[in-house]
Amino acid sequence: MPSFDIVSEVDLQEARNAVDNASREVESRFDFRNVEASFELNDARKTIKVLSESDFQVNQLLDILRAKLLKRGIEGSSLDVPENIVHSGKTWFVEAKLKQGIESATQKKIVKMIKDSKLKVQAQIQGDEIRVTGKSRDDLQAVMAMVRGGDLGQPFQFKNFRD
């Protein structure tokens, strides 16, 4: 019986490469000359800290980071940026989290969306991923298209496709 897993993962090595590329761009840009601006990737907590001297520059740095992440194959929706920018001393910073795994509320939405589609497939929640099984490959591919097309605020990957 064909099956596949729906997961949401971010490759930390690609994220590190994107952060390094963004840091290089900031060093060479004229509008960031003589400005304390940096990116810091924390592998353990899966966060990226964006630091600068003003809140406007933090927003510019976030735009640069999103562009570099997209070039490295990481969607911008996988970056969870809080609304408030923290001011500490003479610096402003924001700590953005990289979304890893699918939250239970999103999992339930996906399973409900699959069941409402009336396709002959079964969806099971397994930890932070969803296993979808069905008799027809076409039904599974229709589920993939539906999950990609659904606006769930998070990028999804499909792994372990078995016939």
Swiss-Prot record:
InterPro entries: DUF520 (IPR007551), UPF0234-like_C (IPR035571), UPF0234_N (IPR035570), YajQ-like_sf (IPR036183). GO terms for cellular component: cytosol. The keyword Cytoplasm does not apply. It comes from the Bacteria. The keyword Nucleotide-binding applies. GO terms for molecular function: nucleotide binding. Keywords: Nucleotide-binding. Belongs to the YajQ family. Nucleotide-binding protein. This is Nucleotide-binding protein YajQ. It comes from Shigella dysenteriae serotype 1 (strain Sd197). The gene is yajQ.
